[in-house]
C-alpha cells in the first residue's frame, strides 16, 4: 500500500479532456508522487476507464476523486471522497456517499477509501456552482474548518480547492497551522514553479491540474518542489 502522507506533488487529470500519449508519458515519468483522475462535469464511466487504462502502464499510485456514482470503477489504488464543508447542499456533505453505500457498501474495501474535508474557494468555478458552496469566507472561517477537520471529524485529508484560480496563501498558511494530524492538500491555479514553491511552503501536498493542458513544460517544472523541500 502506498503512503499518502509522503506525497508532496500530484498531477490531476480530467477524464473529459484530451491529453496526448507523449504528454501523459512526460507527466507519469516526471517524478510526481501520484496521478489523480477527477473533474466536475462530463465525467463518465467510459472516459474514466479510458484514462485509467492509459495511466496504469506506469508504476504510480492512481487515485479516483469521486464526483458522481456512475463513474466509480474498480482498479484504482485509492478513492478520494470529498465532503464539501462549505456546501449548502447536503448531497455534497454526505448525501452522495450515503447513496453509494446503500448500493455498493457491501463490496467496498474501506482501506482504499479516503475522506477529504473539502473547501471550495473559487466562487466562479463550476464546482462552486454545482455544490452551492459559500465561498465568501475569511481566514477565521478557514481556521474553524481546519479545527473541525483535524480535531472533531479527524479526517485524514483537508483539501483547499481553488479550481483554476491561484489561491490566497494566507488562508493556506492559516489552515496548515491548525492541521496537526490532517494532511493539507492545495489545488488551484498553479502555473509556475514559483507558485508551486509558494504553496508548498504550507501545503503538505500540491495538486497541479489545468496547466497540464495549457503548457505541459510548465506543468512538469512544478515537480521540482520535491527536490527543494525539507519536509
From Swiss-Prot:
It comes from the Bacteria. Keywords: Lipid biosynthesis, Lipid metabolism, Magnesium, Metal-binding, Phospholipid biosynthesis, Phospholipid metabolism, Transferase. It catalyses: sn-glycerol 1-phosphate + all-trans-heptaprenyl diphosphate = 3-heptaprenyl-sn-glycero-1-phosphate + diphosphate. One of its GO terms (biological process) is glycerophospholipid biosynthetic process. InterPro entries: GGGP/HepGP_synthase_I, GGGP/HepGP_synthase_sf, GGGP_HepGP_synthase. Pathway: Membrane lipid metabolism; glycerophospholipid metabolism. GO terms for molecular function: heptaprenylglyceryl phosphate synthase activity; magnesium ion binding. PANTHER family: HEPTAPRENYLGLYCERYL PHOSPHATE SYNTHASE, PTHR40029. Prenyltransferase that catalyzes in vivo the transfer of the heptaprenyl moiety of heptaprenyl pyrophosphate (HepPP; 35 carbon atoms) to the C3 hydroxyl of sn-glycerol-1-phosphate (G1P), producing heptaprenylglyceryl phosphate (HepGP). This reaction is an ether-bond-formation step in the biosynthesis of archaea-type G1P-based membrane lipids found in Bacillales. Belongs to the GGGP/HepGP synthase family. Group I subfamily. Homodimer. This is Heptaprenylglyceryl phosphate synthase. The gene is pcrB.
Amino acid at each position: 500500500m502506498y503512503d499518502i502522507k509522503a506525497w508532496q506533488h500530484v498531477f490531476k487529470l480530467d477524464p473529459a479532456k484530451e491529453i496526448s500519449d507523449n504528454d501523459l508519458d512526460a507527466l507519469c515519468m516526471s517524478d510526481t508522487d501520484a496521478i489523480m483522475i477527477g473533474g466536475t462535469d462530463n465525467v463518465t464511466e467510459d472516459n474514466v476507464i479510458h484514462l485509467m487504462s492509459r495511466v496504469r502502464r506506469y508504476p504510480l499510485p492512481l487515485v479516483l476523486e469521486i464526483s458522481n456514482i456512475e463513474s466509480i470503477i474498480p482498479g484504482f489504488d485509492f478513492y478520494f471522497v470529498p465532503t464539501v464543508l462549505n456546501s449548502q447542499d447536503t448531497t455534497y456533505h454526505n448525501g452522495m456517499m450515503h447513496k453509494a453505500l446503500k448500493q455498493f457498501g457491501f463490496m467496498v474495501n474501506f482501506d482504499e477509501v479516503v475522506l477529504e474535508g473539502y473547501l471550495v474557494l473559487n466562487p466562479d468555478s463550476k464546482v462552486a456552482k454545482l455544490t452551492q458552496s459559500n465561498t465568501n469566507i475569511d481566514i477565521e472561517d478557514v481556521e474553524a474548518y481546519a479545527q473541525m477537520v483535524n480535531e472533531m471529524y479527524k479526517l485524514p485529508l483537508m483539501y483547499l480547492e481553488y479550481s483554476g484560480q491561484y489561491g490566497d496563501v494566507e488562508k493556506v498558511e492559516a489552515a496548515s497551522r491548525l492541521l496537526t494530524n490532517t494532511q493539507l492538500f492545495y489545488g488551484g491555479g498553479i502555473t509556475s514553479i514559483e507558485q508551486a514553491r509558494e504553496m508548498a511552503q504550507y501545503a503538505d501536498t500540491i495538486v497541479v491540474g489545468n496547466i497540464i493542458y495549457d503548457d505541459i513544460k510548465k506543468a512538469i517544472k512544478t515537480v521540482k518542489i520535491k527536490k527543494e523541500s525539507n519536509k
